[in-house]
């Protein structure tokens, strides 16, 4: 069997992030992710998001512009939903319940009219890293790639951003996201925690005012606040 290696030049991620995460791409766990991915593709298993969107969160959010990290768990597993951005769905796709609650909170917090589109690309382009902890999923099988090793990669991203950047905002929604708090230096960054926006979660997300709190912090550290409208 041909040995699988990592050709960093072929990873579909922008050069700024490629250099920032170069060491991670060369680690054994990332090679294991690639093996699992290729095995699934060779078995004609459908994986979401499409290959060109797996690193979309990074490709839309320039490293030098990063201001906020919103951590999700894993991609949507139904057709035409996953686009490589946590909580986001493409234009003209029905808005999922969690994202509906996010839009409700935006209205409560900043009086922003709920959007008709669930595409959060505009946030990403302003410096919001919409990062899922797990970056791929098998069609119609939630959390099916949770054993692949993606968490090690996303944990490394969070930890490296915490160490090498300053004045970031980390939004941690739900117990899973809150467990990542240990990766973040709270003397350099603002950590905002709340319940998950899912309607199935206990109350605690609506009313958190994370969006206004994030912008107040960004202004305090001399950064341009985020325009949270969806365009």
Swiss-Prot record:
Positions annotated as active site in the UniProt record: 74
Residues of the signal peptide: none
Top EC class for this record: hydrolase
Keyword Hydrolase on entry: yes
Recorded catalytic activity of this chain's protein: Hydrolyzes single-stranded DNA or mismatched double-stranded DNA and polynucleotides, releasing free uracil
A single BP term in Gene Ontology: base-excision repair, AP site formation via deaminated base removal
UniProt main location, coarse: cytoplasm
Subcellular localization(s) per the UniProt record: Cytoplasm
GO cellular component, one term: cytoplasm
GO molecular function: uracil DNA N-glycosylase activity
Entry-linked SMART domains: UDG (SM00986), UreE_C (SM00987)
Keywords, in A-Z order: Cytoplasm, DNA damage, DNA repair, Hydrolase
One Pfam match: UDG
Source organism, top-level taxon: Bacteria
Enzyme nomenclature, EC number: 3.2.2.27
Function in brief: Excises uracil residues from the DNA which can arise as a result of misincorporation of dUMP residues by DNA polymerase or due to deamination of cytosine.
HAMAP family recorded: UDG
Family note: Belongs to the uracil-DNA glycosylase (UDG) superfamily. UNG family.
Protein name as annotated: Uracil-DNA glycosylase
Source organism: Campylobacter jejuni subsp. doylei (strain ATCC BAA-1458 / RM4099 / 269.97)
């Amino acid at each position: 069997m041909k040995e699988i290696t990592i050709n960093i030049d072929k990873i579909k991620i922008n050069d700024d992030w490629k250099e920032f995460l170069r060491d991670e791409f060369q680690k054994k766990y990332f090679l294991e992710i690639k093996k699992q991915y290729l095995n699934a593709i060779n078995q004609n298993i459908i994986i979401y998001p499409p290959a060109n969107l797996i690193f979309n969160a990074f490709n839309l959010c320039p490293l030098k512009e990063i201001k906020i990290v919103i951590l999700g768990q894993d991609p949507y597993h139904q057709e035409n939903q996953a686009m490589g951005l946590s909580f986001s769905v493409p234009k003209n796709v029905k808005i999922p319940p969690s994202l509906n609650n996010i839009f409700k909170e935006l209205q409560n917090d900043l009086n922003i009219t709920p959007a008709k589109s669930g595409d959060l690309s505009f946030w990403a382009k302003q410096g919001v890293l919409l990062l899922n902890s797990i970056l791929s999923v098998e069609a119609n099988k939630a959390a099916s790639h949770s054993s692949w090793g993606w968490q090690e990669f996303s944990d490394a991203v969070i930890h490296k951003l915490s160490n090498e950047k300053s004045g970031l905002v980390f939004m941690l929604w739900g117990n899973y996201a809150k467990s990542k708090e240990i990766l973040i230096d709270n003397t350099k960054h603002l950590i905002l925690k709340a319940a998950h926006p899912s309607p199935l979660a206990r109350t605690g997300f609506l009313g958190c005012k994370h969006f206004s709190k994030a912008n107040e912090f960004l202004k305090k550290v001399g950064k341009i606040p985020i325009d949270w409208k969806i365009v």
